[in-house]
């Protein structure tokens, strides 16, 4: 499967690129600047070895993929989705986006509606799937890291959700869990500021989640 990581130059994009590429998937790292995407793709290839990882501008990456993952900072994500609307409308689009604000008392969820629902509205698409919000990105980007985390997944299109859950399940240590329709995304996204607050107030490192 060809997976585009739009804005895939951060830790979540790096982790997905390395782990999915070593499983045999074709990875396209997207960025607003092609040279940055190509440089990151070359960096990832050096780590992953004989793997298919290329770099392109976001527009070209979106055009080339079967699945697009919005590994973009929240503040730029909606503009990017709007710019790529005509390309992404018919694609499966994964949203790990979380609107988070940091204040004196900690982290808060900063949106009336879920990021995933906003993306779906912008794209006019039912194929948006909400997932990967609670992945500790720096740990995930380290191939030596061993983990056992659950990944809640929300979506309205059952087939798109099944494809994304199947892809996630290929990564050793991740268990996708169906968390219902896209309207539940706000519940899942709000786990991220909760985790960040637990880390902050307890002096803990990056945390994932596991339902027992």
UniProtKB/Swiss-Prot annotation:
One Pfam family linked to the record: F420_oxidored
Alphabetized GO MF terms: 8-hydroxy-5-deazaflavin:NADPH oxidoreductase activity; coenzyme F420 binding; cupric reductase (NADH) activity; ferric-chelate reductase (NADPH) activity; NADP binding; oxidoreductase activity, acting on NAD(P)H
Biological processes per GO annotation: copper ion import; NADPH regeneration
Catalyzed reactions: reduced coenzyme F420-(gamma-L-Glu)(n) + NADP(+) = oxidized coenzyme F420-(gamma-L-Glu)(n) + NADPH + 2 H(+)
Keyword Cell cycle included in the entry's annotation: no
Binding, coenzyme F420-(gamma-Glu)n: 207
Activity under varying temperature: Optimum temperature is 80 degrees Celsius. Is highly thermostable.
Keyword line: NADP, Nucleotide-binding, Oxidoreductase
Coiled-coil residue windows: none
Presence of keyword Nucleotide-binding: yes
Origin: domain of life: Archaea
Biophysicochemical property: pH dependence: Optimum pH is 8.0 for NADP reduction with F420H(2). Optimum pH is 5.5 for F420 reduction with NADPH.
Quaternary data: Homodimer.
Record function comment: Catalyzes the reversible reduction of NADP(+) by F420H(2). In this reaction the proS hydrogen at C5 of F420 is transferred into the proS position at C4 of NADPH.
Name under which the protein is recorded: F420-dependent NADP reductase
The species this protein was found in: Archaeoglobus fulgidus (strain ATCC 49558 / DSM 4304 / JCM 9628 / NBRC 100126 / VC-16)
């Amino acid at each position: 499967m060809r997976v585009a990581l739009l804005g895939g130059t951060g830790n979540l994009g790096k982790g997905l690129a390395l782990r999915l590429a070593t499983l045999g998937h074709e990875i396209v790292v997207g960025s607003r600047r092609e040279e940055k995407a190509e440089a990151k793709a070359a960096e990832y290839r050096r780590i992953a070895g004989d793997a298919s990882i290329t770099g392109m501008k976001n527009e070209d990456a979106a055009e080339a993929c079967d699945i697009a993952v919005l590994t973009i900072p929240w503040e730029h994500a909606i503009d990017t989705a709007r710019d790529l609307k005509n390309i992404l409308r018919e694609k499966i689009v994964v949203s790990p986006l979380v609107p988070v604000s940091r204040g004196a008392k900690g982290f808060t969820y900063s949106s009336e509606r879920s990021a995933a629902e906003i993306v779906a509205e912008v794209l006019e698409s039912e194929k948006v799937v909400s997932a990967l919000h609670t992945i500790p990105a720096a740990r995930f980007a380290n191939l030596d890291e061993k983990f056992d985390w659950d990944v809640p997944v929300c979506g309205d299109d059952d087939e798109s959700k099944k494809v994304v859950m199947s892809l996630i399940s290929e990564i050793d240590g991740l268990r996708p869990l169906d968390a219902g329709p896209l309207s539940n995304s706000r519940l899942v996204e709000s786990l991220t500021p909760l985790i960040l607050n637990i880390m902050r107030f307890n002096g803990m490192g990056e945390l994932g989640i596991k339902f027992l």
